[in-house]
Amino acid sequence: MTENIHKHRILILDFGSQYTQLVARRVRELGVYCELWAWDVTEAQIREFNPSGIILSGGPESTTEDNSPRAPQYVFEAGVPVFGVCYGMQTMAMQLGGHVEASNEREFGYAQVEVLTDSALVRGIEDSLTADGKPLLDVWMSHGDKVTAIPSDFVTVASTETCPFAIMANEEKRFYGVQFHPEVTHTRQGMRMLDRFVRDICQCEALWTPAKIIDDAIARIRQQVGDDKVILGLSGGVDSSVTAMLLHRAIGKNLTCVFVDNGLLRLNEAEQVMDMFGDHFGLNIVHVEGEERFLTALAGENDPEAKRKIIGRVFVEVFDEQALRLEDVKWLAQGTIYPDVIESAASATGKAHVIKSHHNVGGLPKEMKMGLVEPLRELFKDEVRKIGLELGLPYDMLYRHPFPGPGLGVRVLGEVKKEYCDLLRRADAIFIEELHKADLYNKVSQAFTVFLPVRSVGVMGDGRKYDWVVSLRAVETIDFMTAHWAHLPYDFLGRVSNRIINEVNGISRVVYDISGKPPATIEWE
């Protein structure tokens, strides 16, 4: 029997901070399982989850407003340690008898916190010392309100010049609140504080490791599907590739991978996928030529959301057809990962706007005929990559830039046509090749080319011609929730532009996208 890697677990209640998923990833990096739930969870749900500790996230609301989110009262009655971060500290203070007010000065950015009192949370943790030997911590603040009175059974652990209660603690109950963000890298000792809370105060063991996650996933797959046959849509992306390798280890020849060349893939991608998974790893793969079918279904459609839904629908139709040709296929496997699950849950409960339909989760018809197997649904992307390495997949494949599920279907703006896809494939391949040559590929987080359905005049030789426009897009980001456009060298951009215009007949102009996220998204559609 495999070890119970979920035995020690942290519950993170989400109050809406852009950093909340980062908190969860940091806890996982410490080797401890955690889950992210909406703040209005019930007492029964908390009891059932049985956490070793609870973290209250930051959030954009003000605790001084009457209808602002509050932690369920049971959080403070469950007998487990609680760690409030920013808004989480404020609602903890207010709910336990303290006071919060809007601050005259909004604290945003670096701050130095002076530790005044010994506390299990920060004992022995410091960045520097004051002249009289008190520990100082370099932290990242982001708050407007501030705690002006702490609950009577708490002590002040640390303060800044403008924030009298930067850290508060009730050591007996093991309740802690910090007015800064320990999860961001700008808080230099943040990981040590999270480690102190999760590993020492909550006494969680580091059971959440790649090797143990693989063993657990294999055991769960076998328990779920038994001797049934499973079908998987293999795209060659990180998530579906790691899913394929896990299933192959768990059930061997009972897995049939369906690789659909939908006409929306990158240059030579179909050949590369078949070579690696069919020839090298020995997986059972059915190769479906689907370009004409997908492009016919997409004909005349300009709306990005509709295009995503069409691509998802046709994928499922293809799977159903392939499954009917095989005997006893009862399960459809997918590479759904934890951020997909979080976003889909948020949209289902109305707690967040649907930015885009996830190809894996929201875009699938509800009448799908097979059961779902999702072995990665508890994992963040960085965890999926680590597991892929452990399973023997090549580094370059696992750390390739993200590629959307609908592929070039959302990188060709407006209606998708074969001509547009062919031009885009070749232009994009040149851009990526040049990034590798210039040693820039791993210095940007994501880079790709977008086809714009507008013609622009160009001069070739002695003649004028009207041809298509493409845009290059490269961004730098830590979490893909916010992003800056990458400041690529002008000579590099010039070289890429010249190559595309000279080598791809049909493109007359190349532009570079200098939009950040927000207000733009990373993908154009």
Swiss-Prot record:
Coiled coil: none annotated. One of its GO terms (molecular function) is ATP binding. PANTHER family: GMP SYNTHASE [GLUTAMINE-HYDROLYZING], GMP SYNTHASE-RELATED. The active site is at C86, H181, E183. GO terms for cellular component: cytosol. It is an enzyme of class 6 (ligase). Residues 9-207 form the Glutamine amidotransferase type-1 domain. Pathway: Purine metabolism; GMP biosynthesis; GMP from XMP (L-Gln route): step 1/1. It catalyses: XMP + L-glutamine + ATP + H2O = GMP + L-glutamate + AMP + diphosphate + 2 H(+). This is GMP synthase [glutamine-hydrolyzing]. Keywords: ATP-binding, Glutamine amidotransferase, GMP biosynthesis, Ligase, Nucleotide-binding, Purine biosynthesis. The gene is guaA. ATP binds at S235, G236, G237, V238, D239, S240, S241. Its EC number is 6.3.5.2. Catalyzes the synthesis of GMP from XMP. It holds the Pfam family GMP_synt_C. SUPFAM superfamilies: Adenine nucleotide alpha hydrolases-like, Class I glutamine amidotransferase-like, GMP synthetase C-terminal dimerisation domain. PROSITE patterns: GATASE_TYPE_1, GMPS_ATP_PPASE. Homodimer. Residues 208-400 form the GMPS ATP-PPase domain. HAMAP family: GMP_synthase.
